[in-house]
Regions:
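P-loop NTPase motor module signature
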Residues: 1-289
Length: 289
């Protein structure tokens, strides 16, 4: 019996994360009853069936994971292997990326390329609802899957997450609210806290909560993205997690300054809206370049 119990214990990692705690409790009860001399044959049979069912569900999700492709023109693509290695080898990674680097849309795909997202969701937070919806739409398009399928989002008054969902976009407020009913956040295998430099009250609460949760969830990966504003502070908060810096993609910008009125113009002839229209018309006539 002890050999069977140990074998079942080892199989827990073959199950989805959200099933492991309940199955572990049932296994612990069976072990306690066996030590007390009570019959456990029926309990072990039921546990074996439950483990088989959960393991099959995980196997099917893993086989159905989308295969991502990457745009080599994005700056983050040059760092893809380093980012993947850091995620694989560390529980917490801080990614410092400028606007236009591609970090928001490519990070979930890098996680998918590592096989993450089968045992639990890849949760991806955004500070605002419109950003959560638009990022979900973009990632779904890049993966070639309909929105609400393998890529979904959940914001206030709108829930497009289904049983097939692998990547879940949401506001940081939604994730914070979920800690009330899912204190160990067991539906997630990866959490990406995007735009953490904004330091809203929700983000600060989440970072504090996750700091305490991670030791109890060694199977949870945490990725924090920040602009180039003191990323070392986030690293220190999470026990000196590795920091990876990614440059942004920039374009030349020409700045032109002009007075509202030229010296020879009458003040009554042109107000601010008209001056703006004249400036736009001038740029339009000149064309791109």
């Amino acid at each position: 019996v002890e050999t069977t119990l140990n074998s079942l214990q080892n199989r827990l990692l073959e199950c989805p994360i959200r099933d492991r705690a309940a199955l572990a409790r049932r296994l612990q009860n069976a072990r306690r009853r066996w030590r007390e001399g009570q019959p456990v044959d029926r309990s072990l049979e039921q546990l074996t069936v439950a483990l088989d069912t959960a393991a099959l569900r995980l196997s099917e999700r893993r086989a159905a994971l989308p295969v991502p492709t990457f745009d080599d023109d994005l700056p983050i693509s040059a760092h893809r292997e380093a980012i993947a290695a850091a995620i694989r080898d560390h529980q917490v990674v801080v990614l410092c990326g400028e606007t236009g680097s591609g970090k928001t849309t490519q990070l979930p795909k890098i996680c998918l390329s590592l096989g993450l997202g089968a045992a639990g969701l890849i949760g991806h937070t955004q500070p605002r609802r419109i950003a959560a919806r638009s990022v979900a739409t973009r990632i779904a398009a890049e993966l070639g899957t309909p929105l609400g399928g393998q890529v979904g989002y959940k914001v206030r008054f709108s829930d497009r997450v289904g049983p097939e969902t692998v990547v879940k976009l949401m506001t940081d407020g939604i994730l914070l609210a979920e800690t009330q009913s899912d204190r160990r956040l067991e539906q997630y295998e990866v959490l990406i806290i995007d735009e953490a430099h904004e330091r809203s009250l929700n983000i600060d609460f989440l970072l504090g909560y996750l700091k305490r949760l991670l030791p109890r969830r060694p199977d949870l990966k945490l990725i924090i993205t920040s602009a180039t504003i003191d990323p070392e502070r986030f690293s220190r908060h999470f026990d000196h997690a590795p920091v990876i810096e990614v440059s942004g993609r920039t374009y030349p910008v020409e700045l032109r300054y002009r007075p509202l009125l030229a010296a020879e113009e009458d003040e009554r002839d042109r107000d601010l809206p008209q001056a703006i229209l004249d400036a736009v018309d001038e740029v339009w006539r000149q064309g791109p370049g």
